[in-house]
Curated annotation (Swiss-Prot):
It is found in: Secreted. Residues 1-26 form the signal peptide. GO terms for biological process: cholesterol efflux; cholesterol metabolic process; chylomicron remnant clearance; lipoprotein metabolic process; negative regulation of cholesterol transport; negative regulation of fatty acid biosynthetic process; negative regulation of phosphatidylcholine catabolic process; negative regulation of receptor-mediated endocytosis. One of its GO terms (cellular component) is high-density lipoprotein particle. Pfam families: ApoC-I. The keyword Protein biosynthesis does not apply. GO terms for molecular function: fatty acid binding; phospholipase inhibitor activity. This is Apolipoprotein C-I. Inhibitor of lipoprotein binding to the low density lipoprotein (LDL) receptor, LDL receptor-related protein, and very low density lipoprotein (VLDL) receptor. Associates with high density lipoproteins (HDL) and the triacylglycerol-rich lipoproteins in the plasma and makes up about 10% of the protein of the VLDL and 2% of that of HDL. Appears to interfere directly with fatty acid uptake and is also the major plasma inhibitor of cholesteryl ester transfer protein (CETP). Binds free fatty acids and reduces their intracellular esterification. Keywords: Lipid transport, Secreted, Signal, Transport, VLDL. Belongs to the apolipoprotein C1 family.
Length: 88
């Protein structure tokens, strides 16, 4: 019974393999592939630039840099006061 059921499956698979690639699956020519590389690189560069600019703008608009700067200033002043009182 198993052989009877698997035989049509093997015939279908063999027919698909022997048929070869469909026209849409044919490999593109090397010249067209090489010709499109500069356009793809330019598109990648533009996308990367846009994402980098957006990230920088979001960092500029956030309050993280100001909070970090204030924390460092406060910590530095505390350390400076402690050193001043320790060595006075």
């Amino acid at each position: 019974m198993r052989l009877f059921l698997s035989l049509p499956v093997w015939v279908a698979v063999l027919a698909m393999v022997l048929e070869g690639p469909a026209p849409a699956q044919a490999a593109p020519e090397i010249s067209s592939t090489l010709g499109s590389i500069p356009d793809k690189l330019k598109e990648f560069g533009n996308t990367l630039e846009d994402k980098a600019r957006a990230a920088i703008e979001s960092i500029k608009q956030s309050d993280i840099p100001a909070k970090t700067r204030n924390w460092f200033s406060e910590t530095f002043n505390k350390v400076k006061e402690q050193l001043k009182t320790a060595f006075s």
